[in-house]
A protein has these predicted regions:
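Catalytic glycan-binding domains that act on GlcNAc-containing polysaccharides
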Residues: 1-106
Length: 106
């Protein structure tokens, strides 16, 4: 749960109607295409609903967690860069550092 809260804080700072530069939406900044890949059948606009956004964002985060074998940095690397991400970029390292800091403060 601490990791999920950290991801929401990093991605949107709890702003439900935020839109990212690459089309990410809502609290967890999930892309419509990504949610559809997880089985979502609704509209892009519906992903702004906090409950919907968290449901599908958490599904994606859980997949990243499984692929990373539970490793925090591997999880956020795959959440941010896609489930197929294999290399820890400088951006992913910074994201991991932020997530760890936020998790420690909860």
């Amino acid at each position: 749960m601490a990791l999920a809260r950290a991801v929401v804080r990093i991605e949107s700072n709890w702003k439900t109607h935020l839109t990212g530069r690459a089309g990410e939406v809502g609290l967890m900044q999930i892309k419509h295409q990504t949610a559809r890949g997880q089985g979502y059948g609704g509209s892009r606009a519906a992903l702004y609903d906090p409950e919907t956004n968290i449901k599908w964002g958490m599904r994606y985060l859980a997949g990243a967690y499984r692929l990373a074998g539970g490793d925090t940095c591997g999880t956020v690397m795959r959440y941010q860069g896609g489930h197929g991400a294999r290399r820890m970029s400088a951006t992913a390292r910074a994201y991991c550092s932020k997530a760890r800091t936020l998790m420690a403060s909860n």
